[in-house]
């Protein structure tokens, strides 16, 4: 016969500190105490260190003077030795912007708009800043202007993802009064 014993939260938090962020939600559902202690800064710092993760915000903005795209990472923890997100490991491009991200896997979708002749042709790059890995993906057909871009990671090992691109068809409102958009799905 099994005896009911209280959970040892210190042991449980130690195990959780090695888990990826995608598994944290499952542990937080175990109890209110486990959920509360997993948001304490001592646990967050230990988890970030052990999983080589970042905690913070990515701000995306456009420079009105030079019409360039910029992104800035603001750390959510006050650590001096923690590296900030840096996209300098990407191939030398002129105007890289972060279009979408998957926060569970730490994956970013970056776009660099390059003028080839008189046309703007985007280069799409899927990257993981924590490991400095990137993959330049083939350009989709960009007949229409991009309205929105989304990224969904299917699996991290092997690395599989889907990118959805919503574009404007120039036919703003159809005969039925509906706003027309096109979507492209590529992997």
UniProtKB/Swiss-Prot annotation:
Domain of life: Eukaryota
InterPro entries xref list: F-box-like_dom_sf, F-box_dom, SCF_F-box_component
Transmembrane segments: none
A Pfam family recorded for this sequence: F-box
Domain F-box positions: 2-49
Protein name in UniProt: F-box protein At5g41720
